[in-house]
Amino acid sequence: MVAPLSAQVYKEVDKSPKERLQDFLDETATGINKAGKTIGDFLGINAEGTGDEVKIDGVKYMRIHTSNLFYADSTDMLTLCRKDFAQRYPQAEIVSVVIPQRSWNQTALKEGSKITAYKRMALCYVLAKDGKDGYINARYSFRQLRNPGKRWTTPEGYWPRFDRADAIPNVHYEQLKLK
């Protein structure tokens, strides 16, 4: 005698195929968003920026930083930022190169409830005079990763990584200095 085979049964038989497809697409979009956030967190990227932006006349600028507070590894880091900036903007006159934080921003990366790695980041800002027209404010990031029990490693292209530069007209520069 042959045993009957069970066919695939939809759990939600009261929904039409169109509704089931929409549910599937919604779940897929949620999964993709979570994966994107996880990858962004791992790389130190987020949609909101770093929270150091100021809006003037509808334009978002990074804040101007002129005080170096980071002394751990800063000499070499500042030199690397200065060198890269000078290559990118040879006509600009560098005013300051600073890391405006006291230590590395360090976070633990988790998979569920298990810590899988650590990451740390420091931001470097280069401010330069752009002729008589205004200023250039550039941000670089230094990032490192470490698995538990291992040494810090630097992902390729992140020592330093050029993140962004703002061209700032003189009139906006004066307003940014006050913020």
PLM regions with names:
Residues 2-7:
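Sec/Tat signal peptide C-region and signal peptidase I cleavage site
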Residues 9-179:
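Cystatin/cathelin-like cysteine-protease inhibitor module
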